[in-house]
Design a protein with these regions (language model features):
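Short, small-residue-biased leader/transition segments that mark boundaries at the very start
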Residues: 3-8, 203
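Active-site environment of divalent metal-dependent phosphoester hydrolases
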Residues: 38-44, 69-72, 148-149, 170-174
Length: 203
């Protein structure tokens, strides 16, 4: 949070997170949304923090990488039913849970099952590197398509010496070949994006 800004990532869960933040930071308006990539767990909570009417009335920037809507539609609408069935096996979601734990795939302990929604981007990041001011905060976005998601970007906040890696770097590299049937990623290209992030990000 800086003045009126809060960066919120990921409908019920997002609303609860925002309500919790406002208890401690004050009832500040959401002044921008950044969708780092086309996977539902990174945009599905949008309507929990911002309505379409409010976004339009206040001209709230909704930022996403080029190709975001096409890839979000392809994976979550066209292929969603089949991929959801397969994901049950991938995540072990039907396995028992108890006080001793739960079997998971190393990426997340559980998948949220609330309502999802989407807001169309108003700003597309279509250059390899692109700077943008969002309510007084300077962002520098770097496109990394075909890494963890078909449409993905990472960002740095140079004035705050911070870096948002989205899912470019994770200990599982879970989408090199995913059992749920998402597009297979190019491992070499993904590794090059990680190398580029190391050399380009000045924090």
């Amino acid at each position: 949070r800086r003045q009126r800004q809060m960066c919120i990532r990921d409908r019920e869960t997002a609303a609860a997170a925002l309500a919790f933040a406002r208890q401690h930071l004050g009832a500040q308006p959401v002044s921008g949304l950044v969708f780092t990539h086309s996977h539902v767990d990174h945009f599905g909570g949008a309507l929990g923090v911002l309505t379409a009417q409010d976004a339009k009335a206040r001209s709230v920037p909704i930022v996403a990488p080029v190709g975001f809507m096409e890839e979000a539609t392809s994976e979550n609408v066209l292929l969603g039913p089949a991929m959801s069935r397969r994901a049950g096996f991938m995540y072990g979601s039907q396995l028992p849970r108890d006080a001793r734990g739960v079997v998971d795939n190393g990426l997340g302990m559980a998948v949220a099952v609330g309502r999802i929604g989407i807001l169309p981007p108003t700003v597309l990041i279509d250059q390899p590197t692109q700077a943008l001011d969002i309510d007084g905060v300077r962002f520098v976005f770097h496109n990394v398509p075909g890494s963890e998601a078909p449409a993905e970007m990472v960002f740095e906040l140079p004035d705050l010496r911070a870096f948002g890696a989205a899912e470019l770097v994770s200990q599982t590299l879970h989408n090199l070949y995913t059992l749920r049937g998402a597009k297979v990623r190019d491992a070499l290209a993904w590794s090059r994006y990680i190398d580029s992030a190391l050399s380009l990000i000045h924090i």
